[in-house]
Amino acid sequence: AYLEEWQAMAKAVLELFPPRDDLPAPDTLHTPKDWPDSDVLDDWSLLPTKPDWAPGFRKFWNVGEDAAHDRLDWWADEVGEYDEGRNLPSQDITSQMSPHLHWGEISPVTIWHRLKDKRSKGWKTYEKELIWRDYAQNVIMQFPDYGDEPYRNFDDSLWRNPNRGHLIQEELEAWQQGRTGYPIVDAGMRQLWQTGWMHNRVRMITASFLIKHLLIDWRHGERWFWDTLVDGDYASNGANW
């Protein structure tokens, strides 16, 4: 029933509020008269750069607006296979546009206009996922703590808390480091650590393993994803967990 309601809502959104025109980049930008005070980067408490903890990121990702459009060019040729291939982690049939979207290197409107004439089931499935991304942003506006706390009544006693025992903490660390002994879980978690990304189906599998097999509080998983994903978006990450 939930899935049916979501699909009906996605259809209504497109009918009532079609995406605006894709705006071209401005020819010039005027320099403001006054600049706001800037932050000191060290005050952001970012992860340390020595030792270099993210060399795999630079090998795996091309960053910037040009890279985002290059990836979109590739995706425009592949999106037709998305509906059938999106649940197969062994195949490269996902857009991997999420980091570019998260960091503002490309707009969902730009993606929509580029792909809207693709008359395939794959495009319609992907289109709903773009809407889901905006839906998560809307939810976080209504429930600002959604990324950390559920918006329905919740009993903490359901979950094992790593702060209450060494064994539980060890199980959490084994999950984080890809040492559970379950190949698909370990492969996904190691990929996450090396590249900052994981196939969406494997995200579901690893999250389900933490919650339903290890019975560890989901918020520990949500925080780990938030710390390690290059597309770690507060709204989408919280909504999906």
Can you name each region flagged by the protein language model?
Residues Y2-W159:
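Glycine/tryptophan-enriched, flexible segments
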Residues D92-W241:
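Active-site-proximal binding-pocket segments
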